[in-house]
Amino acid sequence: MEGLLAYGLFCERLPNILSSINFFDYCIKKAPTCDKETSYIRYDAMRNINVPRCIEIPNPVSYYSLCMSISNNWKGFQDYFYRQTYGHVYKISRIHIRKLMKRKEVFKMNYEDWHVDGTPELDLQIGAKFLVEADISSCFPSMYSHAISWAVIGKEKAKVNRNGNEWYDKLDVCTRRIKHGE
């Protein structure tokens, strides 16, 4: 959980004066709770082309609840992703969560070691007609949270089974609490 909470609350584009390491320490000692819907904290950052970019930071206590949900249900995530990727040749991407060597962060948006990691696009392109590129930097705030459970067990089954006791339902609830209950 430390990688998500202490190093994952603020995106890399924010000035490095912002840190959630002390907030992580506070959460470990106090375990704050937030059972209500919260809003993002907005921050306008200037892009290198002199155009502002709106960056929204989740309410820290709601984000802590989301991190706790992920941490407490990690086995469910592991089992799901194992089933989904078993037998796949390409399992590593530059943005998926993975342990970085000698770092506490869980993920980094652009890995510096592309020489070591390799660039699988060329291998994936062989025999393909198209290469799709996507900027997911603004995906999370606009993501439909129910899509999480739909992706895990299927839309129809998720709609029937709404008891909220499964790990993916808990993740859905915590995700909605971060952005106005949406």
Task: Enumerate the predicted regions with their spans.
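Conserved two-metal-ion catalytic palm core of "right-hand" nucleic acid polymerases
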Residues: 1-181
